[in-house]
């Protein structure tokens, strides 16, 4: 990334403004009646919708005392008064709402804050990404059968019938034959290697953006990804008065991601994740067995990464102990 960019002057008053965050959060009235409730802007993912409710507001209010000290010290130590926070968690964990509320409150304190969605930095558009995941699952499932000596034409015809139904993972609990178990396990093992890897996610581009922001860049080109291959573009973002960058992303704890000052993780149950996903307009396929298998693998991966978080909370914003996840 080009580092010959204009840099703003540092703002010494920003730490004091951040310190006002808690009192503002406690006094600000967010409700369905006053209209603010529905008009809080979300992130920068095209077509994304947020559903802010009372639980999300309570979680945000509980979060502020937990992040204020670290946020103030980080802003003070950066020559441009800047800090980067990641809000991560499983799909449907509430990270979009929490990020939106945190940004809204900070902006109300005149601490310029911008949200970027990591979902804009997948290598492939959603439809192609889902297709690639399915290809990897099927290819490696069949390879596992071949390598274990469990593949023949008769078995392949049976497998194809399940594949044409787009539901082989849905049959996993019903078919107990060894060859099918090998297929499912081989496919899932390959998915585990692919999901959240640099083959799927463009960590390099995100790391460049984070680095440039902390280095004082006044402008950044941010990626936008819609639902099809005509909806992929870049927008120039004015960062002159932005002091906090919130990365809202499932993979905010990834070892491939650098430059994050405070990593926040929202711990949810599989039931909470499922209920949230099916209620979102951009997740029409959330109920499919294959997507549920993908979510389960991602959830396992995220659980292993929880100890690397700086702060762990539940959906209600209550702090959880790291000792429970070591």
What are these regions (language model features)?
Residues 1-78, 262-265, 275-283, 299-326:
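NTP-dependent small-molecule kinase module
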Residues 92:
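Walker A (P-loop) phosphate-binding loop of P-loop NTPases
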Residues 95:
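Conserved lysine of the Walker
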Residues 98, 102:
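Hydrophobic positions on the alpha1 helix immediately C-terminal to the Walker A/P-loop
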Residues 104-114:
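Post-Walker A helix-loop "phosphate-sensing" segment adjacent to the P-loop in P-loop NTPases
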Residues 113-114, 121-229:
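Conserved nucleotide-sensing/catalytic segment adjacent to the nucleotide-binding pocket
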Residues 175-182, 231-280:
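ATP-dependent NMP and nucleoside kinases share a basic, alpha-helical "lid"
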